[in-house]
């Protein structure tokens, strides 16, 4: 069940990961989160900002950690919130924990301006 979330952020499940992420034509930022995760509430507005800023060059998906153990294991997510920037099956960037707006934008600029 693909649903649009705030400003172009798509909520996906393990079952949709291959289609929505691995087969995407553009880079994909995967945001792993949980409803019980306080720091995730700090990251969510930054994810929405990234969608607004880079939506023409970047696909952004969010995955709730608990119901999606396959992606969590495959991408070695050990803490939340976590971000994985992928192009196809290649992980370009990997972060865990809250990062600043400047760090997020810098990380994305580094990869998206080289397209």
Feature locations, PLM:
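N-terminal targeting signals for export/organelle localization
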Residues: 1-8, 49, 113-115
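A short glycine-leucine-enriched loop at secondary-structure breakpoints
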Residues: 74-78
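The canonical Cys-X-X-Cys-His
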Residues: 37-40, 83
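Short pre-active-site segment immediately N-terminal to redox-active cysteine/selenocysteine motifs
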Residues: 25-26, 33-36, 79
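Thiol-based oxidoreductase modules, predominantly thioredoxin-like and allied folds used
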Residues: 12, 32, 44-51, 55-69
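A short beta-strand-turn-helix
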Residues: 9-27, 69
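Non-catalytic, surface beta->alpha helical segment in thiol-disulfide oxidoreductase systems
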Residues: 79, 84-115
């Amino acid at each position: 069940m693909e649903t649009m979330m705030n400003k172009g952020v798509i909520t996906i499940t393990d079952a949709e990961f291959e289609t929505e992420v691995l087969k995407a034509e553009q880079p994909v930022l995967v945001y792993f989160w949980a409803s019980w995760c306080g720091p995730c509430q700090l990251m969510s507005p930054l994810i929405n900002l990234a969608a607004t800023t880079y939506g023409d060059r970047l696909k952004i998906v969010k995955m709730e950690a608990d119901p999606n153990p396959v992606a969590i294991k495959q991408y070695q997510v050990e803490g939340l919130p976590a971000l994985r920037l992928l192009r196809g099956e290649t992980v370009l960037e990997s972060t865990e924990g809250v990062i600043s707006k400047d760090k997020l934008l810098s990380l994305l600029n580094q990869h998206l301006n080289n397209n």
